[in-house]
Regions:
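P-loop NTPase motor domains
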Residues: 1-191
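Preference for short coil/turn "hinge" residues that link or interrupt alpha-helices
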Residues: 51, 81, 104-107, 125, ...
């Protein structure tokens, strides 16, 4: 994570207090990164340098800095950061990010795995963040998106493969101005939408609420695939983003059937109405709508069902 992403996860204050906390975190984080042998061989590093560090080092440095304070100086900022750090380390939901076992330099291996280099006939990576705690989901998506962008920038002199980054529920991460919160994920996805082509990165945004997307990002989409939309506001938003010659298709959007869509833009020679092929059942994602009538008419096995669901719920798996 870079410094901005650390702030989103570790800082709980706001206003002037947040700036004070951020300054303290920047100083301590840089000191923790500097303890790594990689930092010592590279020379000068910054707080954003992708150098691994030990959480225990960060904790100890915070403790040391707090011990240097005069009595008149408030230790509240240090206590806030340490308390949040201890809370994250103790919560099993955050073990994938803050486990004490994650102390090695695994960056190259991680990138090879995520980017499928080599692909070995399987060039697609699917990253499911549904099990990630909701308060850091955006940060996790920001880290992954920034890895894609930074890898492309620093790999310009290499023959790296173009990457298509597809983001589901995109309105959560690049919301319109009314709902924008200045998060790091919105900044990096907006930057990829505007600059990614120069570095061989394309961005695919999937949303059921296009009117909630940032207009600046949607305007960068060269190809639009529109499925059935019933909301007038969403239809108007999609119409504004469509090329002039495709707007006549908009009247048919509310009447589209399942698996039908309107495609227009750079990806097709002319705007067209398309029906997707039916996938075999074992290849479909678990997103099909349940049959209410069929399930309501079935009885039996409810007690065991509840037990199984509660067990998975409690174990978070």
């Amino acid at each position: 994570m870079n410094f901005e992403e650390h702030c989103e996860v570790l800082l709980t204050s706001s206003g002037n207090e947040r700036q004070v906390d951020a300054d303290i975190l920047a100083k301590c984080l840089l000191a923790a990164r500097s303890k790594n042998r990689l930092a010592q061989t590279m020379g000068k590093i910054t707080v954003d340098s992708p150098i691994p560090y030990l959480l225990s080092d960060l904790n100890n440095i915070l403790q040391e800095e707090m011990g240097k304070l005069d009595k008149a100086t408030s230790s509240a900022p240090y206590i806030r950061i340490k308390s949040k750090l201890d809370e994250l380390k103790a919560d099993p939901r955050y073990q994938f990010m803050f486990s004490g076992m994650l102390v090695g330099d695994t960056m190259a291996d991680f990138i090879r795995k995520i980017f499928r280099l080599p692909s070995n006939g399987k060039p697609i990576s699917i990253i499911d963040v549904s099990g990630v705690p909701s308060d850091i989901t955006s940060t996790v998506v920001a880290v992954l998106s920034r890895l894609v962008f930074d890898f492309a920038i620093w790999g310009r002199e290499e023959k790296t493969r173009p990457i298509l980054l597809v983001c589901e529920e995109a309105h959560r991460y690049v919301p319109n101005e009314k709902n924008a919160d200045g998060s790091s994920v919105a900044k990096i996805l907006s930057r990829i939408a505007k600059e990614g082509r120069k570095y061989g990165i394309s961005l695919g945004l999937i949303t059921q609420r296009p009117s909630d997307l940032a207009e600046g990002v949607l305007s960068q989409c060269g190809t639009i695939i529109a499925m059935r939309l019933n909301n007038d506001r969403d239809q108007a938003f999609v119409k504004a983003a469509m090329p002039e010659g495709a707007r006549g298709f908009l009247d048919s959007i509310p009447a589209l059937r399942n698996r039908e869509c309107i495609i227009c833009g750079e990806g097709v020679a002319i705007p067209m109405r398309v029906t997707f092929d039916t996938l075999e059942e074992h290849r479909r994602p678990a997103s099909e709508d349940p049959s209410f009538v069929e399930l309501w008419s079935q009885e039996g096995g409810e007690e065991e069902l509840v037990e199984r669901v509660v067990m998975r719920w409690r174990s978070q798996g």
